[in-house]
Amino acid sequence: MTKSELIEKLATRQSQLSAKEVEGAIKEMLEQMATTLESGDRIEIRGFGSFSLHYRAPRTGRNPKTGSSVELEGKYVPHFKPGKELRERVDAVNV
């Protein structure tokens, strides 16, 4: 599901809100989440999951085109850990 699809689905389900209002709310929510992670804080949405930063240590990688070694710096990357309710719902899916 893309952001546009999410906006459309929420606007359809919440008929009292316009698509523009839903779009604004989603953009603001995502902006607040990004700002929180930028400041190094953790985000927890009970039942859904948590977002945090994990440190990736410096390492030697490879350039896929040339095969040559490349030194990669250490960095923080966003990490999502699903909550219990979300894990249980996904586990129950028979694909």
Curated annotation (Swiss-Prot):
Transmembrane segments: none
Sorted UniProt keywords: DNA recombination, DNA-binding, Transcription, Transcription regulation, Translation regulation
One Gene Ontology cellular component: cytosol
A Pfam family it matches: Bac_DNA_binding
Residue stretches in coiled coil: none
Keyword Glycoprotein: no
PROSITE patterns: HISTONE_LIKE
Family matches, as SMART domains: BHL
Entry superkingdom: Bacteria
GO MF terms, alphabetically ordered: DNA binding; structural constituent of chromatin
GO biological processes: DNA recombination; regulation of DNA-templated transcription; regulation of translation
Family as reported in the entry's similarity comment: Belongs to the bacterial histone-like protein family.
Job of this protein: This protein is one of the two subunits of integration host factor, a specific DNA-binding protein that functions in genetic recombination as well as in transcriptional and translational control.
PANTHER family assigned: DNA-BINDING PROTEIN HU (PTHR33175), INTEGRATION HOST FACTOR SUBUNIT BETA (PTHR33175:SF5)
Assembly: Heterodimer of an alpha and a beta chain.
Name by which UniProt lists this protein: Integration host factor subunit beta
Organism: Shewanella oneidensis (strain ATCC 700550 / JCM 31522 / CIP 106686 / LMG 19005 / NCIMB 14063 / MR-1)
